[in-house]
Amino acid sequence: MELNDGNLQTLTEYLQKTLSADPAVRRPAEKFLESVEGNQNYPILLLAVLEKSQNEVIRVCSAVTFKNYIKRNWRIVEDEPNKISDPDRTAIKANIVNLMLTSPEQIQKQLSDAISIIGREDFPLKWPDLLTEMVNRFQSGDFHIINGVLRTAHSLFKRYRHEFKSNELWSEIKLVLDTFAQPLTELFKATIELCQTHATDINALKVLFSSLTLISKLFYSLNFQDLPEFFEDNMETWMTNFHNLLTLDNKLLQTDDEEEAGLLELLKSQICDNAALYAQKYDEEFQPYLPRFVTAIWNLLVTTGQEVKYDLLVSNAIQFLASVCERPHYKHLFEDQNVLTSICEKVIVPNMEFRSADEEAFEDNSEEYIIRDLEGSDIDTRRRAACDLVRGLCKFFEGPVTGIFSGYVNSMLAEYAKNPGVNWKHKDAAIYLVTSLASKAQTQKHGITQANELVNLSEFFLNHILIDLKSPNVNEFPVLKSDAIKYVMTFRSQLPKEQLLQAVPLLVSHLQAESIVQHTYAAHALERLFTMRGGNNTTLITPTEMAPFTEQLLNHLFKALAIPGSSENEYIMKAIMRSFSLLQEAIVPYIPTLIGQLTHKLLLVSKNPSKPHFNHYLFESLCLSIRITCKANPDTVSSFEEALFPVFTEILQNDVQEFVPYVFQVMSLLLEIHSNSIPSSYMALFPHLLQPVLWERTGNIPPLVRLLQAYLEKGAAAIANTASDKIPGLLGVFQKLIASKANDHQGFYLLNSIVEHMPAEAITQYRKQIFILLFQRLQSSKTTKFVKSFLVFINLYSVKYGAIALQEIFDDIQPKMFGMVVEKIVIPEVQKVSGQVEKKICAVGIIKILTECPAMMDTEYTKLWAPLLQALIGLFELPEDDSIPDDEHFIDIEDTPGYQTAFSQLAFAGKKEHDPIGDAVSNPKILLAQSLHKLSTACPGRVPSMLSTSLPTEALQFLQGYLQAATVQLV
């Protein structure tokens, strides 16, 4: 694309159309941009639109499009074309910083994100001047520019908070500190001075406090991995100023908004985080400053209101206290009973209260409430912080803390009992306090795994939880009922089984609750209970125990999906999946009705897939329906095809990218259930599966390969007879896959199925070309993964067509090549083959080479006979060689960037491991002994002579054992 006004105008028009609410206008525009983004100058044109357009909306749209383009395409992935030309990369890096700093804030944020994406790949090695260019802008004195630099630096450096330690990381952080730490400190001091100068200018203060917050975030990132020498030397400057800012109260910066945190709250929140980091990780160096921070943060907590805008500040302040009280260094600060009582009364109990804002979220923003409460994204909530503080205090003072809090729990429950209708929030806080007190260790899988022995969880369940679960009106007091359900879920590993069984039918009844939170919690609790393990690796709750409630459970789960707000509730769908899995054949009578409901739901969500987890569990539930029903009666497979194929056809025709990989997996499962034939409906689809466009998306590759394997397994003869013109297309797919380090193993899966199932004559003309392609890949890019797959393939070929055919095809490509492959690949590398089936294939293939290939006995290949036998005995007896060369680098499929749908494996569509040799060989060691006996009978004296002169003693001893086990001997 040329850099000219015409192209700028065209691009502007298409960007405008991507903003249209009409899909008929929007989608073609999106497709057009997708089709041209591979052209040189495309990103430069986007930046030109961003810079020159008079329309602010178009400028922002261009910035967002540019950022997403960078996100998808900047990383260079091995085996894949470079999607951005080198001149474009250079031009982007030369211009983007200046463009970002001179743009309005909305655009600045997008470009700042783009810089951090580029920086993640290129900084510092391929973009060495980035930091210097940014630091130089500190001198500008323009805080719009300075904040742009700080924002970009923050997005660039925040990954230091969660990266694993490595020499490469240390080198990068050292470079950043050497260039950035001193200017950042000077800027920090200068900004604080300016705050004092402009103490009465609200507009100036807003900009300056934004800067201070960003500077504080950078401090956190740069200090996270280790305490840098520079910051240790300058601790006085940073900590004194942090403390002053923490105690600052400027009326101008206070906001009337009760929801949104103001600049002062955001800054103080970050300073609490910074202090907590130092208290936790660098307690020795931080000790002189700790008492004044404890005092300042304590004062902050007891003087800050209950408004939502203070939530982040209060939770970070409490987290600071939690991190301090857990450290043995600071234990003395909390030993006094009065201190513990004061913390409980003034900090913990007030911040555990269920506020009107929480009630609003529970009723009107249930999805966010659930994510926060169930999935642990409540990291910034007051309740979570208060709970962490309770746990921290219990580390050293479990007895006193439990005693103090038990008094509060009892008084809260007494208040509730006086007037439940008015005082229900007291019981809510009591349950939360008990949960905090009792929880010592928790996992997603098991709930609470270690509990405070001073809290009787079972007694609390009987006295206070069961009554809410049993309440005949499921819609009364939804918060308390949700609390009760969550209590069962949280303490499921601590409560006795009889109490859990008592809870199950009650939880089933709560699936009917109108409250989204309540019926979601009920579904989630049931799903978690159904995954608990009992003795002998079985489920704790058995299908027999569920029998009285099975119909009600399935009915209520599917009805819950019809409650407004829960039509795509992932917790309900996961509970459906888990119920199917637990109940197994008990669901068969209900499937004719339920499959219609599942299919209808699939049709609806395929119009606009927006809930990936819901969709995944929906497909898992379909797979379970198919597996369980067809296990009992394989003939029912046709009724599933009848129900599902119309929806599948629509999904494939509309190219619903998120669902296509799932459809292929379910089709594979269905096809694999058929006896050895392919129905015509599948054969009609076969040519479409070979279209190159389908194979462009990495997420399609594993399920498509499996589906093609199912076609070959069930109908290779039919393909050879009626669709032989498609065999080149099938091999074209293999050729594409084999060229990629990420997908070569998938290419071998396909090739092995072709060799195993296709009639020999159907692929004779292609065999030589297949081997040539494999050799070209071996020469150009040999990896351990490829070699292992190659070994399995050539040995399968030996098993299928015979060792002579294998030797001849190698030597036909190039004289003596067979010997080279045996010597350079098979003998040294076979020890690396992993997997029982793979090892068996290699063993049987090598046995055939040793005993059924005359060239191994009568030509220059004879010298390889004993080493090959030794390698085979090593495969049987030695541990697997899992070493990988130092310089080898595998591309992980999940690591490939971009917006493509990643492959999501359906657990319940799982394919059974296939053994192409099967029962024909049960023990390869016995087969070796029998085959050597047969060979020695054909040429007496030769085999013992070769063994005695060339095989090491240890290998001979193993071989002797095989011969004895097979009751044969060599002659």
Swiss-Prot record:
Coiled-coil regions listed: none
Gene Ontology biological process terms, A to Z: body fluid secretion; protein export from nucleus; protein import into nucleus
Pfam families hit by this protein: CAS_CSE1, Cse1, IBN_N
Cellular component per GO, a single term: apical plasma membrane
Topology within the bilayer: Peripheral membrane protein
Keyword entries, A-Z: Cell membrane, Cytoplasm, Membrane, Nucleus, Protein transport, Transport
Keyword Lyase: no
Localization annotation: Cytoplasm; Nucleus; Apical cell membrane; Basal cell membrane
Function, as annotated: Export receptor for importin alpha. Mediates importin-alpha re-export from the nucleus to the cytoplasm after import substrates have been released into the nucleoplasm. Negatively regulates fluid secretion and plays a role in fluid homeostasis by down-regulating cftr activity.
Protein name: Exportin-2
Species classification: Eukaryota, Metazoa, Chordata, Craniata, Vertebrata
